[in-house]
Amino acid sequence: MDRLARLGGRKWLLIALLLALMFLLLLAGFATTRPVDSRPKPPLGLITTLPLFWSEGGIEADLAKDAAPHPAFTRLSAHYDIMPVDDLETWVPRPKQLLLLAQPRAFAPNELVRIDNWVRQGGLVLILADPALQWGSLYPLGDNRRPLFTSMLSPLFAYWGVELVLPLEDKVPTSMRKIGVFNIRTVTAGEWLPKGDSAKGRCAILAKGLLADCRIGKGRAVLLADADFLDTAFWEGRGMRILTGKDEFANMALLRALLAALQDDKGLRGDFVEK
C-alpha cells in the first residue's frame, strides 16, 4: 500500500510539473506573438552639457565596445527619437518635435532669439536649468567639456517673466521633494520667482517654485529649476533595484510625465498638483 501511495504521489507530482511547463510555454508564446508597437517615436531634440550622449572618458572610451550612454538617456530613447542639436541657426525642427534643454551651453543672443521665436510660433520646450549643478566630472572647472555649473539662460527667463534663484535657506543640499504624485531626490535645487513685466509670457509657478509652466505666444515652455535629478546617484537606488527591480525615486517618471504633458499641450495639473 505504501508503495502504491508513493507511486500515486509521484504521478500527481509529474502531472503538476507538466501542467506548469505547459503554462510557461503558453506564456512564452503569448509574449512572442503580441503585436509590436510600430508607431514612430516622437522626435525630441536635445541640447545639453551633461554627459548623456557620451561618456567623459574621451573618444577612446566612447569607441570602446562596452561604451554606453547615460541611463537617463537610455530611458528616454525608449520612448523618443532623440536627436542632438548642435547649431540652432541651422536647426530645422521636425513636425511636432519637442525640444529638451538640459543644462545647455551658453547661447549667443541670436540663438536666444531663435528659441523664443520658435516657441512663440508653437514650439514646445522643456528646460532643466540648474543654478548650482553638482554633477561629478573628470574635468576641472573652466574646461569646456565639463557640465555647465550654473544656467546661462537668465536673459531668456527674464524676457518670459521669471527668474532662477538658489534658495539660501536650504541647510541640507540633498533633499527629497514631492511634486504631486512624484517623490524625487536631488541636490541644490533652484526656485523660480516672478520677475518684472511678464507680458511677454504667462508663467504659472508650481511645486513651491521648482516648476514654471509658461504660455509663450502659440507655444509653451516648461521650466524645472534643477538638472542634477537626472544623475543616477539620486534616483536609481541599486539596493532597491536588486530587491524590487524599480527605481528608488521617481525622477525619471517625472521627466517623462513633463514631456508627455508638454507633448499633449496640457497644463501641469493632475499628477503635478499636490493632493
Mark where each language-model region is:
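Short, surface-exposed patches at the edges or C-terminal ends of soluble domains, predominantly
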Residues: 2-275
